[in-house]
Amino acid sequence: MKRTRRSLPANFDPVYPYDAPKPSTQPPFFNDRKGLTESSPGTLAVNISPPLTFSNLGAIKLSTGAGLILKEGKLEANIGPGLTTNQEGQITVEKDSDGLTFTSPLHKIENTVSLSIGEGLEDESGTLKVNFPSPPPPLLFSPPLAEAGGTVSLPLQESMQVTEGKLGVKPTTYSPPLQKTDQQVSLRVGPGLTVLNGQLQAVQPPATTYKEPLLETENSVSLKVGAGLAVQDGALVATPPNVTFSAPLEKNGNAVSVRVGAGLSIQGNALVATTSPTLTFAYPLIKNNNHITLSAGSGLRVSGGSLTVATGPGLSHINGTIAAVIGAGLKFENNAILAKLGNGLTIRDGAIEAVAPQPSFTPVTLWTGPDPNVNASINGTPVIRSFISLTRDSNLVTVNASFTGEGSYQSVSPTQSQFSLILEFNQFGQLMSTGNLNSTTTWGEKPWGNNTVQVQPSHTWKLCMPNREVYSTPAATLTSCGLNSIAHDGAPNRSIDCMLIINKLRGAATYTLTFRFLNFNKLSSSTVFKTDVLTFTYVGENQ
């Protein structure tokens, strides 16, 4: 007997035959198209779709959106002020409600809202329309105005300029020795010059008197020399006497000797007579009775039994040597007799000249005063109290500065952005108003005797400026800058960097000094912005 083969579904999987859900064979039986469903298999559940959903307790609830609300188990419209529902359940506007207000150009008259329109507008069949006027006639321009390519321009002469969109006259600049103070132009004069009755005149130096042996002749000073002295090639030298030697004396180099003949000899550096049956004496020896004498000629003499050189005025014997005798105003130097010069005298081209004394230099200090107010701005807001002094001594200018923050800059953090404080000066060394530390603050010269600020400009202010030839291009000095070091007792991670930038010019400035604060990320936390005293030096400007 053959066994009947069961038919299998088309998607039957003989390896995993348990994926397809099996219909429940247990009551109650249900139809999933009439509100019930099986979820999960073998479990009877209510078949719902949005806006129906289940609450956390498993109850069926209605999800509501904007404008709807459940009230006392009923779904209602969520209406606001000025709206209501009528007896038919329709949403209407309350007649006496002031929930809707209208402002000009809208107006409400009874149940009608209207729009007020002005000139250039019109209502055309319920549509707002703009009435465009007819185009105006083309513009004509007469000199000095000119039009080219739709642009109107104004030609300028050399004396005119446009600054920030405004027409003005170019400022007149003055080069040394001219200077401008207030509304006047003056001429700076140095030693030896003066201005008298509006005219530049030379100041005559005081008359110089000369004492012997100096002698003034016309515009030169000369030295009178006596016997034994002479001026050769502009130098004072001693002239030895013209000594001649006659036989038996003879000169060999620097030595004088006596030639001896018969009956004489030199023994032990002495002239002695030798035994001779007959002695004869030749000139300059002379026999007088039993004495033999030496006849000394010009320039020689016998003194104390010795033959010596006869010396005249200005010459003397010193240790067996003929030497010149010098008086006041002369000295020996390198085997020559020279004039002894005091202060204010020098030798030039062999002549003694008076030297004009060098002018003394008085140090100059420009500063903000000992305790300035908040005098520096960042982004237009005054927030930095800056103490700055510039001191010119000799050829160098020393910069001393310290800075304290106020307001939003009272403290800084590691994320603080870099910022700069800029001083800009004109050609006379006067502080301009174009920097963020400018001439509207206290600035001027410090007197020697007190701590005030003299704001009246002086020609010496230029000496405190950076030398434009040395710093023809911008130069910088970078130094570490401690913050609030006294309070933190020099703790680490409490310093930033400060860069002094010299002559980074902009605009009309002739000299600039820029203090740039950077590298705030070196701080470990927020810190009071109160810098240590910073010191810089640079080469000062010429007068």
From Swiss-Prot:
Residue segments, region Disordered: 1-36
Protein name from the UniProt record: Fiber protein
Compartments in which it is found: Virion; Host nucleus
Note: All late proteins expressed from the major late promoter are produced by alternative splicing and alternative polyadenylation of the same gene giving rise to non-overlapping ORFs. A leader sequence is present in the N-terminus of all these mRNAs and is recognized by the viral shutoff protein to provide expression although conventional translation via ribosome scanning from the cap has been shut off in the host cell.
Domain writeup: The tail region anchors the fiber to penton base capsomers, whereas the shaft, built from several repeated motifs, allows the knob to protrude from the virion.
Function: Forms spikes that protrude from each vertex of the icosahedral capsid. Interacts with host receptor to provide virion initial attachment to target cell. Fiber proteins are shed during virus entry, when virus is still at the cell surface.
InterPro entries xref list: Adeno_fibre (IPR000931), Adeno_fibre_knob (IPR000978), Adenobir_fibre_prot_rpt/shaft (IPR000939), Adenovirus_pIV-like_att (IPR008982), Attachment_protein_shaft_sf (IPR009013)
Chief location bin: virion
Pfam families xref list: Adeno_knob, Adeno_shaft
Keyword terms, alphabetized: Capsid protein, Host nucleus, Host-virus interaction, Late protein, Viral attachment to host adhesion receptor, Viral attachment to host cell, Virion, Virus entry into host cell
Entry similarity comment: Belongs to the adenoviridae fiber family.
Cellular-component GO terms for this entry: host cell nucleus; viral capsid
Description of what induces expression: Expressed in the late phase of the viral replicative cycle.
